[in-house]
Amino acid sequence: MLQPSAQGSYSKAVLSTFRSLEDLTCDGSKIILDGQSLNVSSVVAAACHQVPASISKDPQLHARLRESVELLARKLAEGEIVYGVNTGFGGSADTRTDDYSTLQQALVQHQASGVLLPTDRSSSRPSSRYPHGLRSHSMPTAVVKAAMLVRCNSLLRGHSAVRPEVIEHILAFLRSGLIPVVPVRGSISASGDLSPLSYIANALEGNPDIAIQNEATGDVIRADEALQQLGLAPLRFGPKEGLGLLNGTAFSAGAASLVLFEANQLVLLSQVLTAMGTEALAGSTGNYHPFIAGVRPHRGQIEAAGNIFHFLRDSRMATSPGADGASHSSSLAQDRYALRTASQWIGPQIEDMSLASEQVHCELNSTTDNPLLDPGSGHMHHGGNFQATSITSAMEKTMSAMQMLGRMIFSQCTELINPALNNGLPPNLSFDDPSLSFTMKGIDINMSAYMAELSYLNHHVSNHVQSAEMHNQGLNSLALVASRYAAETVEVLSLMASAYLYALCQALDLRACHLEFLRNARSTVDSLTAELCLSFSPLLSESDQRQIQDSTWEQLLHHWNRSSTSDLHDRSRNAASHTMGALVELLPMQLNEATALPTRLAPQQQWLDEVSATLAGSYDATRAKFQSNPTTPFYLCSASRRMYEFVRKGLGVPLHRGIVDHPTYPSVTEEHAGQELIGSQVSKIYMALRGGVFRDVLQDCWYSSDSVRGFAGEELVLASKL
């Protein structure tokens, strides 16, 4: 028999990055750069958590740096033509000069041509004279920091003839939180990210027109003032150092690393959300059975199915194939596609994101300059390692994965909110009567807006390449543009995931309350049905009576679910009335034919009245008790329970009780004071997701479910790359 495969390398690798980041952010941790071992976790640690970086003391590394500088000096002494050192740049490389230092200044001068707003270059607030609200034109600080780290690591490989002190200057800025203000647009990532990197090079020169932001205080000073604060002298570049600083993919690779870290988190979260959705909709665990994935053995599908199947193994809400109540003649024989094909949908995204992770890791530890110096052979090579197409490829896969996961979440969420599809849950997931409460209707609309925007963003940037720079750069990767738009897809999918998680917690509460209601009401309804049976046939056998009770309850539950759009009193009456007809057909008519019609109808009317009252009273009592003592965790699988309790307890996002939770609703009790908007509650989830707070609970979901069996002690190649 095929066994569940929850040992997927992708999940392990992503979880490994979480642990790696935790280790790096411990007090006293430091990133050691050696040109060989930089990973995404280290980039995130430096860019987002102020973890300092320094150069390895490995003597071989320092020897490589020295030898590359010496090799270039020999080539120039021998009169060799070296692009960008004694020639012009790009389509102007037909010029020659021996004024090497001035040529490097000319390079950083002409590339610093991007647009920044006055407010980007100062500590002041945006001016009101721009009525349309100009948003910042500067690169996010975290991206600039990531680029600084990545460029240092690449230069340490010793193929660019850049002195160690140049690299140390960059790291001094980075460690002190003095970050150049860099335009967000202007790079085509062809000969690397020339324009944005030129702002870092200009900062090292002490250019007074370069703005430097103090990350700790928000103050903005000039680059020459920043050098004075650091106790550093302005640099005068060696023959190839300006080119070595600019001619690389650091901004693309740095931005891609930050995007990838969050995107991978969302891929894991989508699997937990699918498990929660399966429970909320009373779906089938059979959707994710290992046999299904095993006979179509795509690696990603096997991993996704294995994870979700393991998550659900201890659920009391999801149904199992062949279990009592798993299906009814009146319900769909199988779940709709949003759940049933989730593993087939997530699987290819896992495969794409695995490859994207490998591509970005490789780029972080690559030499992306031109020309390249090989001290070992004494040769120099003119080529195109600055073309960042691998990053473009990784980011376009990421954009596609985010859109595909968004489409799945959108389908699951809209099914959850729609009473025609959600298997008996109230419309709009309202906790109170639906005539005056429309809880998730706004989120339903929000999700449509998010989905439309996410789909718009998912267009291959590489389709829009334009020839540049005298047609010398006829091909250019647009990798930084791709990274920027991939970041947008991560943002929008994070909004969708947050809204969906809010709706899921509400739905799980409603489902649990429903199960409590069924448990409380069943015995009374069975007693009333038994009394009705005996009034028609005093000699009815116990087994026949039980059969009638079971059939009646099933019919009653069916009509209860179908009338979820009605307020409680009407819903109870409708369910009982529609069930009455089926019950009459089941009753053994053994009364004397001479018995008067009113006499025969009286027991039926009594049953109808009492069952209606029982349903309404039981549901109302259950609902009231549930508010103060929710039993939802009891029914959930381990993974769902941890995510649910994280939202409810960790983030303080409560069950939405309906109109009484509106902040301005008239209330006579203090318990209703301080209520928040639905959007404010979703915002708590969103900020926690974007702030990295979800990493711990995601790890708990995997470890608590034992979904990644054999994880401890097993090192994966992919994990080290992430």
From Swiss-Prot:
The keyword Lyase is assigned to this record: yes
Family to which this protein belongs: Belongs to the PAL/histidase family.
GO cellular component, one term: cytoplasm
Enzyme class, spelled out: lyase
The reaction(s) this protein catalyses: L-phenylalanine = (E)-cinnamate + NH4(+)
Domain of life: Eukaryota
EC number: 4.3.1.24
Molecular function GO labels: ammonia-lyase activity
Function, as annotated: Phenylalanine ammonia-lyase; part of the gene cluster that mediates the biosynthesis of the ergot alkaloids lentopeptins A and B. Within the pathway, lenB provides the cinnamic acid starter unit for the synthesis of the N-acyldiketopiperazine intermediate by the NRPS lenA. Cinnamic acid is condensed with the Ala-Val-Ala peptide chain by lenA which leads to the N-acyldiketopiperazine intermediate which in turn is converted into lentopeptins A and B by the cytochrome P450 monooxygenase lenC.
Modification type 2,3-didehydroalanine (Ser): residues: S191
Modification(s) after translation: Contains an active site 4-methylidene-imidazol-5-one (MIO), which is formed autocatalytically by cyclization and dehydration of residues Ala-Ser-Gly.
Keywords assigned: Alkaloid metabolism, Lyase
One Pfam match: Lyase_aromatic
Species of the source: Aspergillus lentulus
Traits of the deletion mutant: Abolishes the biosynthesis of lentopeptins A and B.
Protein name: Phenylalanine ammonia-lyase lenB
Residue positions of the active site: Y83 (proton donor/acceptor)
Linked residues for 5-imidazolinone (Ala-Gly): A190-G192
Pathway recorded for this protein: Alkaloid biosynthesis
Gene Ontology terms: biological process: L-phenylalanine catabolic process
Ranges where the record places region Disordered: 117-136
